[in-house]
Amino acid sequence: MCISKEDEEDPSRNRRNQSPLSLPQTLKHFQKDLLAGAVMGGVVHTIVAPIERAKLLLQTQESNIAIVGDEGHAGKRRFKGMFDFIFRTVREEGVLSLWRGNGSSVLRYYPSVALNFSLKDLYRSILRNSSSQENHIFSGALANFMAGSAAGCTALIVVYPLDIAHTRLAADIGKPEARQFRGIHHFLSTIHKKDGVRGIYRGLPASLHGVIIHRGLYFGGFDTVKEIFSEDTKPELALWKRWGLAQAVTTSAGLASYPLDTVRRRIMMQSGMEHPMYRSTLDCWKKIYRSEGLASFYRGALSNMFRSTGSAAILVFYDEVKRFLNWGGI
């Protein structure tokens, strides 16, 4: 099968009327997908980093020793919300502290977003090619969801040490001399000495549960609604329509998976602790519900909705970056 020049230049073209790409052709586009995802991921995530840090602190403050305190530590007043976090952090630690943990986040996000996008397209092509014309089990929305989930799980396993480092550094509050970790290397080396490799990968099973839901809806939902709303006569949706659909899909995916994300962040906070608060993922669910109530699973969700604008931008402009790479012959 050959690909027309028009199809090559339009990565968002409706696939309903196209034959599936062969595996060699899919692999040929893998590197371009990787580059497009990396470009969008690092730039957008740096812009929304302060909101991301607010969200993480609100999620984890009930298991954050620096806030709740322990023997020898008095603790600090809890944050009431995103704006309370921003005002207090700027006043107590300076403006640049809003970006604390962003270095590890960008290091994580470049490969994570790049792998998510490229593998999502690769897995979807494999799933659709595995279905015959008479058997479309892995076509349409199901293939999109499964491809998004599989890509998310693969990428998470690869970058998980950076993911947990980002969470712990972002949740590490106070003046430089009072912080628990000095940076990525110090965090990883400290946790490895205390807990070994297990400590660096603490919370991975819980994280995979959330990624299956979030990435399946995030990638699969967006690809599906693009196909539904596209017209045969005009397969490419207008930019503003794609933005609206991306924002709706991103917000929905974030809310649906948010309790799972809260649990995984709480478990991440236990690496290096002598007396962990939670014995398992299930124990974490039970204790949060019993001691803090159902609302605690959604603490920081408003900040996450603001942050989702950045995630929506990645979905929308990913196609634009790919088109630019095609135009430039990269």
Swiss-Prot record:
It comes from Arabidopsis thaliana (Mouse-ear cress). ADP binds at residues 108, 120, 264. Residues 1-22 are annotated as: Disordered. PANTHER family: ADP,ATP CARRIER PROTEIN 1-RELATED-RELATED, ADP_ATP TRANSLOCASE. This is Probable ADP,ATP carrier protein At5g56450. It is a multi-pass membrane protein. InterPro entries: ADT_euk_type, Mit_carrier, Mitochondrial_sb/sol_carrier, Mt_carrier_dom_sf. The chain crosses the membrane at residues 27-61, 103-127, 137-171, 203-230, 236-270, 300-325. One of its GO terms (molecular function) is ATP:ADP antiporter activity. Keywords: Antiport, Membrane, Repeat, Transmembrane, Transmembrane helix, Transport. The keyword Lipid metabolism does not apply. Disulfide bonds: none annotated. It is found in: Membrane. It catalyses: ADP(in) + ATP(out) = ADP(out) + ATP(in). Monomer. Residues 1-10 have a biased composition (Acidic residues). A motif (Substrate recognition) lies at residues 264-269. Gene3D superfamilies: Mitochondrial carrier domain. ADP:ATP antiporter that catalyzes the exchange of ADP and ATP across the membrane. The transmembrane helices are not perpendicular to the plane of the membrane, but cross the membrane at an angle. At least 2 of the odd-numbered transmembrane helices exhibit a sharp kink, due to the presence of a conserved proline residue. GO terms for cellular component: mitochondrial inner membrane.
